[in-house]
A protein has these predicted regions:
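Catalytic domains of cell-wall/extracellular-matrix polysaccharide-remodeling enzymes
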Residues: 72, 94-196, 200-223, 229-230, ...
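Extracytoplasmic soluble-region selector
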Residues: 1-30
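Short acidic, S/G/P-rich loop/turn micro-motifs used as interaction or catalytic elements
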Residues: 8, 44, 202
Length: 240
C-alpha cells in the first residue's frame, strides 16, 4: 500500500529478477463535498437526450444505471459514453418477480447486459444498482435473496450502489419544485452524496429541476462527479 501526504506526482521504481518496473503516482487534493447524480431506468428518446443536454450545458458528468436499450436507442447509450459519463447497469430487465427468483437469475440479468454493452460499445461495466435498491422489500417472495446476493455480488466482479439522497421523482414528488427541494435539502457536506433520479419516459418533474439542482450545488461548494469503481460505495440496510 502506498499513501501520499502531499499533492503532487512522483515516480516509483521497482526491480525484479528480470524486469524493472516504473509507476507514476499522483496525489490529488481530496474533494470533500461531492454530488454524484445518478439516473435509473433509461435510456429513452424523450428524457435521456434532455438530461444529457442539461449536463453538457453545465459541464457536469453523471452516472446512468441503464436497462437494456431498445435497438432504436442504442445511439443514446453511445452518447452517454462519448460525453464522458459513467455507463452502469440496472439490469437486462427490471421485473421484480423475475430478477429476484434466485442468485443465478439475478447474476444472469447483470451478465447479459454487461455482455451486450461490451459487444456493442466495447465498455466492460462493473457498476450496478439493484431494481428497488438493496433495501427493497419487493423481493420478499424469495426470503433472504437480497442477503445472499449482496454477500456474493463483489465476487462476481460488480460494485453496487444505492443512494443517500432521494429525489422521489418516481413517486411522492408532485412537481419539479418537490424534486428540487428533496435533493437540495438532502445534500450533506463532507460526504459523497449519491442522488437517485430517473430518466424514464417523460419524467418532466426531474427535467424541470435538474438545471436548478446543479446550479444550487455549484453555488454552495459542491463538486459534481460520475461514480467509478474506486468511489466509496453507498449501501442501504438489507431488509430481506
Amino acid at each position: 500500500v502506498v499513501t501520499g501526504k502531499k499533492v503532487g506526482t512522483t515516480t516509483i521504481y521497482g526491480k525484479g529478477a528480470e524486469h524493472t518496473y516504473r509507476c507514476d503516482l499522483t496525489v490529488n487534493k481530496k474533494i470533500k463535498n461531492i454530488v454524484y447524480l445518478t439516473f435509473d431506468d433509461g435510456p429513452n428518446r424523450y428524457t435521456t437526450p434532455k438530461v444529457l443536454d442539461i449536463l453538457k450545458e453545465n459541464n457536469v458528468k453523471a452516472t446512468f444505471f441503464e436497462l437494456k436499450p431498445a435497438k432504436k436507442d442504442f445511439d443514446l447509450t453511445k452518447r452517454v459514453i462519448d460525453e464522458g459519463h459513467t455507463l452502469a447497469m440496472h439490469g437486462y430487465q427490471h421485473k421484480y418477480n423475475i430478477v429476484y427468483k434466485s442468485k443465478k437469475v439475478y447474476k444472469q440479468n447483470l451478465d447479459k447486459l454487461r455482455n451486450l454493452f461490451f459487444k456493442k460499445y466495447g465498455v466492460w461495466c462493473t457498476l450496478s444498482r439493484f431494481p428497488g435498491g438493496s433495501s427493497n422489500t419487493v423481493s420478499r417472495y424469495n426470503p433472504g435473496i437480497m442477503t445472499r446476493i449482496t454477500k456474493d455480488i463483489a465476487g462476481w466482479g460488480y460494485h453496487y450502489f444505492d443512494w443517500n439522497v432521494a429525489s422521489c421523482d418516481s413517486d411522492t414528488a408532485k412537481n419539479a419544485n418537490d424534486v428540487y427541494r428533496n435533493v437540495t435539502t438532502g445534500l450533506v457536506k463532507g460526504r459523497g452524496n449519491v442522488v437517485l433520479m430517473h430518466d424514464f419516459y417523460k419524467n418532466d418533474k426531474m427535467l424541470g429541476a435538474l438545471d436548478k439542482i446543479i446550479k444550487y450545488g455549484k453555488k454552495h461548494g459542491y463538486t459534481f462527479l460520475p461514480l467509478t469503481a474506486s468511489t466509496t460505495e453507498v449501501h442501504h440496510k438489507v431488509n430481506n
